[in-house]
Amino acid sequence: MDFLISTSLSESTSTSADFCVVCGDKAIGKHYGAVACNGCKGFFRRSVWQNLQYTCRFNKQCNIDKDHRNACRYCRFQKCLADGMKPEAIQNERDRIGSTKRRKRSGANSENNSDSEGTPSPKIEVMGNSVSRKLIEMLLDIEHRLASNQSMNALLRDESEMKNSRQRAVNYLIGWTNMLHPLPEVPLADKVLLLKKFSSAFTLLGTLQRSMALPHFVLPNDQVLSISASHPPELFEALTRIIDELLTPLRRLRTDHAEFSCLKALLLLNPDVVGISNNTRERIREARDALLKTLFAYMSNTQNSIDASLRVSSLLMIIPSLISVSSSIMEFPALSDLFGLGDVIKRDTISPKIETPPLEMKPMMPKIAQPPVTSAPTVPTNIMMNKDLISQIMNNPQLFPLLPMPQTASPPMSFMGQSEFGCHLQSMPVKVILS
């Protein structure tokens, strides 16, 4: 989706009044039906173009003057309307401008027309609300399909596998990979590189999402891990780092489900992974750029452009910490098993295989005791597979019928590449068992 970029047309000025009827600042002419300064003109146009909704934190009678006009956007917008500014005048201006894709920005006009107070800059209009909403809904639908799929739930909540966080995490990850465009269509070798790079961070992000409103961690197998000073120092330090660097920022932002889904998709849609093909790199870059525009548009529905930009930046800054923390957890096998952060693919093998695991998942960290969790006894009833993990799952959907897969290998393209999904290929799911 392309950004729509336009610069406003020069407007006729008026010398009949010297002061803005909204805030009392020096006026630059008559705009949208009222004599206004450049700041109030830009504020009113932004509010109407982006359909921004404001709220007043006080009694809806805030003083709007030159020094306090930015204190309450709700009262400022209401004063714009009360003093004669007409929203329909802005629509008429947009009609005169026409399609911005066929226009070149004019430097002379941009100097005389500005959406900011004091600093001229071109107006950026993000993709339409309906388009961005559609992509957000599609990402949320991936989460819903994975959470509500009866075959998956029956498999992952089997009494004999209640302890296996890693098992649940890898099934969840590959479910996303099978549904997020363009990953189902990229070469196998590129999928391997992407999953090797970001599987741990992706899984940890899911645990953070489940733990947002709770004082403890909710692991992939729905068990609870509490933080206690009685834990060994190394373990306590690792858990504290998760809280300080990840959970606290996410809670401070009050990250919602849509934003979590976007973060998960952004983790997997990283075009900078070393070794992927140029064609895959370009396809992933296009999908990522569309997702970033969508995330900005989603946030712009409830706040102004500056605040939306800051929020997008704050969320993106969490990704490097997510990758760093998940890598550090991998140094403690017992803890990484609990969080389901085991590698999907063995990093030290050129042709990755699924090795036969021991009958019971045992901690491999002698110096750090595994944190106590409530669990059921483990019964070794796993189905073993000894062929290439990724090729079996990605290239043969019948080995992983946990999701409604496309009926063709390359489904008809719609927004972000998603089309209608077919029925289950097989009623009995097969589980991928990892060592």
UniProtKB/Swiss-Prot annotation:
Disulfide bonds: none annotated. CDD domains: NR_DBD_HNF4A, NR_LBD. Changing G33R: In qa6910; strong suppressor of the developmental delay phenotype of hif-1 mutants when grown under iron limiting conditions. Residues 17-92 bind DNA. Disruption phenotype: RNAi-mediated knockdown causes enhanced resistance to infection with the Gram-negative bacterium P.aeruginosa. Knockdown suppresses the developmental delay phenotype of hif-1 mutants when grown under iron limiting conditions. One of its GO terms (biological process) is negative regulation of protein localization to nucleus. It is found in: Nucleus. It holds the Pfam family Hormone_recep. Belongs to the nuclear hormone receptor family. This is Nuclear hormone receptor family member nhr-14. Expressed in intestine and head neurons in young adults. One of its GO terms (cellular component) is nucleus. A zinc finger (NR C4-type) spans 20-40, 56-80.
